[in-house]
Amino acid sequence: MFEMKARDSDSATWQDEVYDLLRQHNVTQFAYVPDGGHKRMIARALADNAAEAISLTNESEGPGVMIGADLGGARGVVLVQSSGVGNLINNLSIITLGRFPFLMLVSMRGDFGEGNPWQFPMGQAVEPVVQAMGISTVRIDRAEDALRIVDFAISQAFRGRKPTAVLLSQMLTGRKLA
């Protein structure tokens, strides 16, 4: 029988490369709800004296924090899991109507190799729902594509002022069995 091990997100070098890329593009605010898929990036932000790691009470606070960052002259990113995206949908309308720059990295659940049936509904609804709110989406399935796609998303979100969500698939972050 074929057995696939879950990927260890702590040692995933693609996360370090993406963090470094965000910092090179002057992203200094990292708003997050604790999540295993973003564990490494959150740890980097917490350890970085030139960045601000902002723990959110829930995902709905993310868009408001990013609006505040923009109005204060800073750049930020929201780090959430797909199951929490439903909590921020209404607040995305403020982002799109105000044409605020917005970048969100979403660690996906409910796709490749998912072992928890509770993750399927929102995991499969994230992309169409976020797109319906006027947010562009791009997906990363392979570590070797991470830098190129995130660089595109950064440019689109901040230079083009087109709100963008980067969906980090379970093929990238690792299969979750529970």
Task: Specify the residue positions occupied by each region the protein language model found.
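Thiamine diphosphate
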Residues: M1-A178
